[in-house]
């Protein structure tokens, strides 16, 4: 496929030099004083607000140009493994806009509509995951992980178990799990995979002890494989009254087919910004949910919506709640997006997500499994939502690495897959097509991979020089990631240009 990205010499919006141009008239200070009785002390007032002066047309053109130099799901396939970059139906945006004039401090009686949405989302997500109750208070995925860890920690504290200081984490779990456990001072112990890419149950049995607080894993795992021994794993964890935590990063591969709660999981966190089609990866913020079963319901973050006498209220606080993970009630706008997604698909549509995402992955595998230079752990095992190929042989024979393959894909109109993760796969290319990509796109992606690898064997320099068709060409990654080069704000950029902050050349 022939593809070239736009290249605009577009300045930062703060660098526009116009004067007296406006797109929106802000009331003058004297006008504001007449309307509101706020007198800001002189020492707290800004002398100069330092905002650019632009017309509405200039602002529109600025952001349109930036969008043309960007890439997202609306442009083409984004096969980022463990990210579930599916298409986000645009009707969700209309539904989310309905929340814009609501305020979280309004009295419950004035926001019955949104409370009803939250109430049913709590119920629907519990039903989908096989849990008893869900809290929507967590704002994103990593916050959901932390909430789960806090719940496990508090559970053992209520039992007087100060010795429960070990958190087991599968080496094929989601990448942020160890960090979440470490934040609560747990000693992280990795459970290695066997030759099949699954949790090694024999190793698990040896490590589980009276010091084990819980086990964090996801199913399917990060290799896209279903943990077929999950019921035995749950039995071993529960034998010492530890808790089994489910990371929802990979739920898309089984959604509507099997449920974590039926596998023995005690806590489930969900990413509404992955599985339930809320925009993310530059289109954020995300949104999360944390669900619990049995006695772990008592530890959920508050508040939760309850219904009494036909009225909804944010009055339910679980007995041993870990408290709030964020302010107010989570990212409510994104909860509404996910609500719209579930409502639009219905039970029948939801039941097809896991099946279609699995079909897409295995179709891609059928196209790529015999490609020279690529290897696959347990190639005879079907995958679920994603697949991880190793480009180790390709790198050894041609010098073209997984990173180079990813760069070359950009030149062909595809976003790059996740690379070098999980760490137990050398030169990893983690590909997740999702259920929303049509067969023709999957075929084009497979053809692109084959072309890149064939070129790597015949003319590796051509691949090493990519990307050429993108707005930004290949960066010096050492300089780009060095602390003295990272420029997070316009003010930092300006200070660098003025020589007031050093930079790596």
Swiss-Prot record:
Annotated transmembrane regions: none
Swiss-Prot/TrEMBL catalytic activity: N(6)-[(R)-lipoyl]-L-lysyl-[glycine-cleavage complex H protein] + glycine + H(+) = N(6)-[(R)-S(8)-aminomethyldihydrolipoyl]-L-lysyl-[glycine-cleavage complex H protein] + CO2
GO cellular-component term (any): cytosol
Required cofactor names: pyridoxal 5'-phosphate
Keyword rRNA-binding: no
Single biological process term from Gene Ontology: glycine decarboxylation via glycine cleavage system
InterPro entries assigned to the protein according to its UniProt record, in alphabetical order: GcvPB, GDC-P_C, GDC-P_N, GDC_P, PyrdxlP-dep_Trfase, PyrdxlP-dep_Trfase_major, PyrdxlP-dep_Trfase_small
Catalytic activity, EC: 1.4.4.2
Coiled-coil residues: none
Molecular function per GO: glycine binding; glycine dehydrogenase (decarboxylating) activity; pyridoxal phosphate binding
N6-(pyridoxal phosphate)lysine modifications at: 274
Enzyme class: oxidoreductase
Keywords recorded for this protein, A-Z: Oxidoreductase, Pyridoxal phosphate
Subunit structure: The glycine cleavage system is composed of four proteins: P, T, L and H. In this organism, the P 'protein' is a heterodimer of two subunits.
Purpose of the protein: The glycine cleavage system catalyzes the degradation of glycine. The P protein binds the alpha-amino group of glycine through its pyridoxal phosphate cofactor; CO(2) is released and the remaining methylamine moiety is then transferred to the lipoamide cofactor of the H protein.
PANTHER family xref list: GLYCINE DEHYDROGENASE (DECARBOXYLATING), MITOCHONDRIAL, GLYCINE DEHYDROGENASE, DECARBOXYLATING
Family: Belongs to the GcvP family. C-terminal subunit subfamily.
Protein name: Probable glycine dehydrogenase (decarboxylating) subunit 2
Organism the protein comes from: Sulfurisphaera tokodaii (strain DSM 16993 / JCM 10545 / NBRC 100140 / 7) (Sulfolobus tokodaii)
Species classification: Archaea, Thermoproteota, Thermoprotei, Sulfolobales, Sulfolobaceae
Gene: gcvPB
């Amino acid at each position: 496929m022939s593809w070239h990205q736009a290249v605009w010499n577009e300045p930062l919006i703060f660098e526009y030099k116009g004067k007296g141009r406006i797109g929106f008239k802000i009331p003058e200070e004297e006008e504001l004083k007449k309307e509101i009785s706020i007198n800001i002390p002189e020492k707290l007032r800004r002398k100069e607000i330092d905002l650019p002066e632009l017309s509405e047309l200039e602002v529109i053109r600025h952001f349109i140009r930036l969008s043309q130099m960007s890439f997202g799901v609306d442009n083409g396939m984004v096969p980022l493994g463990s990210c579930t970059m599916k298409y986000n139906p645009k009707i969700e945006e209309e539904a989310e806009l309905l929340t814009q004039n609501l305020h979280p401090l309004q009295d419950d009686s004035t926001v019955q509509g949104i409370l009803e949405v939250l109430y049913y989302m709590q119920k629907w997500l519990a039903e989908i995951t096989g849990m008893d109750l869900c809290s929507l208070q967590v704002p994103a995925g990593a916050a959901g992980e932390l909430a789960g860890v806090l719940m496990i920690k508090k559970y053992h504290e209520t039992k007087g178990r100060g010795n429960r200081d070990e958190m087991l984490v599968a080496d094929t779990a989601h990448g942020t799990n160890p960090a979440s456990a470490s934040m609560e001072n747990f000693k992280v112990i990795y459970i290695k995979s066997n030759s099949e890419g699954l949790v090694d149950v024999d190793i698990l049995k040896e490590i589980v002890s009276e010091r084990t607080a819980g086990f964090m894993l996801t199913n399917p795992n990060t290799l896209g494989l279903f943990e077929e021994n999950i019921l035995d794993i749950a039995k071993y964890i529960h034998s010492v009254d530890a808790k089994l935590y489910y990371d929802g990063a990979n739920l898309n591969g089984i959604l509507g087919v099997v449920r974590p709660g039926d596998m023995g999981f005690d806590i489930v966190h969900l990413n509404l910004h992955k599985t339930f089609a809320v925009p993310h990866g530059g289109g954020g913020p995300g949104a999360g949910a944390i669900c619990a079963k049995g006695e772990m319901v008592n530890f959920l973050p508050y508040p939760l919506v309850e219904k009494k006498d036909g009225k909804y209220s944010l009055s339910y606080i679980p007995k041993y709640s870990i408290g709030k993970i964020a302010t107010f009630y989570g990212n409510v706008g994104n909860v509404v997006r996910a609500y719209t997604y579930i409502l639009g698909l219905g039970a029948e549509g939801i039941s097809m997500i896991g099946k279609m995402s699995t079909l897409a992955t295995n179709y891609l595998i059928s196209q790529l499994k015999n490609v020279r230079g690529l290897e696959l752990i347990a190639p005879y095992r079907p995958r679920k939502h994603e697949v991880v190929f190793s480009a180790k042989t390709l790198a050894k024979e041609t010098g073209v690495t997984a990173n180079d393959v990813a760069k070359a894909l950009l030149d062909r109109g595809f976003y790059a897959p996740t690379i070098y993760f999980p760490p137990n796969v050398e030169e990893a290319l983690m590909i997740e097509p999702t259920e929303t990509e049509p067969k023709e796109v999957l075929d084009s992606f497979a053809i692109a991979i084959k072309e890149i690898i064939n070129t790597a064997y015949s003319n590796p320099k051509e691949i090493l020089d990519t990307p050429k068709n993108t707005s930004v060409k290949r960066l010096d990654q050492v300089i780009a990631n060095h602390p003295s080069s990272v420029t997070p704000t316009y003010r930092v950029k300006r200070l660098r240009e003025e020589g007031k902050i050093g930079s790596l050349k």
